[in-house]
Amino acid sequence: QVASDEGTYTLTSEVWFDATIEQVFEVYKYWEYATKFSSAIVEARDLEPDEFGRAQFYIRNRGCVLFFCQSFERQGYVESESNVVLRAFANPETSDFYHCNESWQFSVQNGGTVVTYDLSMRPKFWIPPAIGPYLLKRKLKKNGGQAVDRIELIAQAIDHE
């Protein structure tokens, strides 16, 4: 579900993976995995912790919607509780967003893992207001489905015993 309100976009999704919670959490925990499951992410890496000891991340995305192509960066910090929740907060001084906050909630269900994703972002770049939400939703659905399959395969290959 994608919504917009005066330039701020929100998204909520829920996905079930045929993998353990430990395996799935590990895929999300390390930002380097992102380039393996999302074609929109062209660079991703974990950075050294900040002065408060918080894990840091950097991601560069590239995407096109119709004829409009954009490359954008996010850099910020992560808060996490192992196998329960990850929260990422982009720093507006080093990102192409006024704000971009994400959270992933992990739970065991039906012999697998459910991940509930919430995003709130206000980009510094232009998204066409009349059709932006529709195009963003379409793009996320298309790329998201492919990413889900890849995440599951990566998670299943992680050995957690």
What are the residue ranges of the model-derived segments?
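Mid-length scaffold segments of soluble, non-membrane domains
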Residues: 33-71, 79-80
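Beta-strand/loop substructures that line and gate deep hydrophobic ligand-binding cavities in soluble
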Residues: 91-138, 142
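Hydrophobic ligand-binding cavity/cleft-lining segments
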Residues: 1-52, 145
